[in-house]
Amino acid sequence: MFPLAYPLLFVLLGALSWWILPIISPLKRHHKLPPGPRGLPIIGSLHTLGALPHRTLQTLAKKYGPIMSMRLGSVPTIVVSSPQAAELFLKTHDNIFASRPKLQAAEYMSYGTMGMSFTAYGPHWRNIRKFVVLELLTPAKINSFVGMRREELGTVVKSIKEASAANEVVDLSAKVANIIENMTYRLLLGRTKDDRYDLKGIMNEALTLAGRFNIADFVPFLGPLDIQGLTRQFKDTGKRLDKILEFIIDEHEQNSSNGNASGDFIDDMLSLKNKPSNTHDELSKVIDRSVIKAIMIDIISAAIDTSDTSIEWILTELIKHPRAMKKCQEEIDAVVGVDRMVEETDLPNLEYVYMVVKEGLRLHPVAPLLGPHESMEDITINGYFIPKQSRVIVNSWALGRDPNVWSENAEEFLPERFEGSNVDVRGRDFQLLPFGSGRRGCPGMQLGLITVQLVVARLVHCFDWNLPNGTTPDNLDMTEKFGLTTPRVKHLLAVPKYRL
């Protein structure tokens, strides 16, 4: 999304700037914008963001304030860094900031404005979100896949148990990613893999591409030049992905006509698409093949890179803090016992486990800058003018580490801070926004929470975990990398010991 280092590119842009600057219209200078860094012509403050933009923006906010104005390329950008400011943008004035900017990756690899995640606010987006919430992600639908989640998790626990017997080192990051991938594909497709195509491979390629910094998203006049070669890659990957999705939809339609529908999400979407137009009238009008494919991509991209990154960081913190790990195990042993494994029905009774999950999401929100919002009209907030089509970035990472909210130990992993607290992760408490809030809050939040809690509880209950190769909790590498999500740079490796 943002550059790691593009010094030559920025030098060239800086040289161009003195020629192009006179023809660029300034922002409405007679209005009072929020304070912020001045930036350079053309590139604005892009060159300052570094490898971890959420950390850079937090540092800048300490200087300029919780509502900060800057230019990223030619895009006027507002950075929100306090719970009070986040509430203004995501609740009080949510109707103004509910849109999304147009991004090249979405245009070429996610059917433009046909899906939900990247679509501008309007009737089409409202209908698609309504369909996803009321048809695909209902509590009943989520509960109907309890057996699938149990089966997939059981398979991975079995493989880790075998590694435990052999005293082998386990790549926990890879194991968790495999669990989430398999659960997601079974939810969507009714199966985890098919030798006739490599959906996992092409989706991983698409997600990697989408997470790369694309100068054309910030300096649009450079788009046609494709100086990074990304446009060509977006188009090529999008075409190959479309071919696979078309094959999958054709197969589901054939199975449905033969009475062999499996009841997965694609079957649900095709069922609505094929209903008479007087049934679910507004929804049936907008659900076509392109929309179905866009929703498929939305669900895969929203599930795979988010839940596994959350679980990876929560397990990392527990291994780094053995006292918290032991406390989790003691609670689960008391509630569940040691004669069976944790089930979803146990989760409401595992209060400390949920505190651990909340603390992990506070310190390591998977999308530290959430999804970018875009203002749909001019507005004044706290005396500051926010121009129409400004890009709004909510620094969820900074919200979760604000010492004014979380006290001076905000950087510490301390699940007990949630003891007796009503602060939750569902978007009502603006100091903790791992899933966003308002109209653009994550519609799959409940499914994501269930999945994260279940996987963490099962792996903690079934195994003791020790660090390999002389690594200790004190020197465990906690370095993160920035993209669509913010996973660990190095995979989490540990030696399991089965305890049930």
From Swiss-Prot:
Presence of the UniProt keyword Cell membrane in the record: no
- Supply the alphabetized keyword list: Heme, Iron, Membrane, Metal-binding, Monooxygenase, Oxidoreductase, Transmembrane, Transmembrane helix
Q: Which Pfam families match?
A: p450
Q: Which GO terms describe its molecular function?
A: heme binding; iron ion binding; monooxygenase activity; oxidoreductase activity, acting on paired donors, with incorporation or reduction of molecular oxygen
Note whether Membrane occurs among the keywords: yes
The compartments listed are: Membrane
What coarse category fits the chief subcellular location reported for this protein?
A: membrane
Q: Which family does it belong to?
A: Belongs to the cytochrome P450 family.
What's the protein name?
Cytochrome P450 CYP736A12
Protein source organism: Panax ginseng
